[in-house]
Amino acid sequence: MIDTIAIIGAGLAGSTAARALRAQGYEGRIHLLGDESHQAYDRTTLSKTVLAGEQPEPPAILDSAWYASAHVDVQLGRRVSCLDLANRQIQFESGAPLAYDRLLLATGARARRMAIRGGDLAGIHTLRDLADSQALRQALQPGQSLVIVGGGLIGCEVATTARKLSVHVTILEAGDELLVRVLGHRTGAWCRAELERMGVRVERNAQAARFEGQGQVRAVICADGRRVPADVVLVSIGAEPADELARAAGIACARGVLVDATGATSCPEVFAAGDVAAWPLRQGGQRSLETYLNSQMEAEIAASAMLSQPVPAPQVPTSWTEIAGHRIQMIGDAEGPGEIVVRGDAQSGQPIVLLRLLDGCVEAATAINATREFSVATRLVGTRVSVSAEQLQDVGSNLRDLLKAKPN
């Protein structure tokens, strides 16, 4: 009998799981525990509309009235000290312990910081929560120089927003291209060109070695000696799963809490979802996917599994972004093996879809200003029908017709 489900982490994954549990008819107690003071909100806006000042606060994931109507016990500002797995109890820094029958870890991740000289200077920011976005927005003034260390999604989104605020922007990317991990080299190069067209300066193969300044950051010094002046710095080099509770309790972890395709951890009554969890991928391997859409899917899967309901097949990374005025959607790993097939022509203003084809199956897709085509491409990835490069390239054909082909 499952009388009580506790969820540690009241963000996107935690709140989505609570909603999914109620939607599936669970009538027992749900405790949603968060150490932040805010109810779950849409973090994808922090680098865009909130940072731009177009929204004072991000939209809520769920209406605040829902929690009360669904009889979900929300405890914000509550910090967990440890897990007592043997007795199925959560210990807090203060107050009585909380017993559970099933536990979901949805503690998310924190911004990775740089352990280099000058890292404690004023004016150096990270972007992970609302307070971070508000602090960065206050720091950015027209005419100032912002240096972004890291050319991933958040860095490129902030660069786009900062240029709209008339801020001078330089991106320092340690690798040879922007956005390779999520978009691949080809799309990364295209995004770099679009950012440069906006006035963003991009320095590749630029490894930040130290920050320079007296109390306030004034420059970033690269490993090769390049000096980049800065009034404000954003360190955007990824995130670290907040898996300390799980590790301390003896739950298996490796760059996140290790889970199976149902979200179950090495402890039978404990599940994990969202950025803290390393999930198995369809193409093999296991990692934290760190996307809004995957966090939602993982939370729904874990909720089903806690109630012994069927769960879907292993996941495929799915995300979206807005960079330099373009909407980019992606599914799968763009840099995997196979052939990259391009559908559309950027020079003529057509929507563009890049599809990674392997052994006659679409394994990944990236769509640029092509929302309708991406919807079909997502189904091609999911159904694994047999297609050819010529069929995918033919813009005169309807991608939807390819769904009728036989699975490979």
Curated annotation (Swiss-Prot):
The lineage of its organism: Bacteria, Pseudomonadati, Pseudomonadota, Betaproteobacteria, Burkholderiales. The keyword Flavoprotein applies. GO terms for biological process: catabolic process. It comes from Paraburkholderia xenovorans (strain LB400). Pathway: Xenobiotic degradation; biphenyl degradation. Part of the electron transfer component of biphenyl dioxygenase, transfers electrons from ferredoxin (BphF) to NADH. Its cofactor is FAD. This is Biphenyl dioxygenase system ferredoxin--NAD(+) reductase component. Keywords: Aromatic hydrocarbons catabolism, FAD, Flavoprotein, NAD, Oxidoreductase.
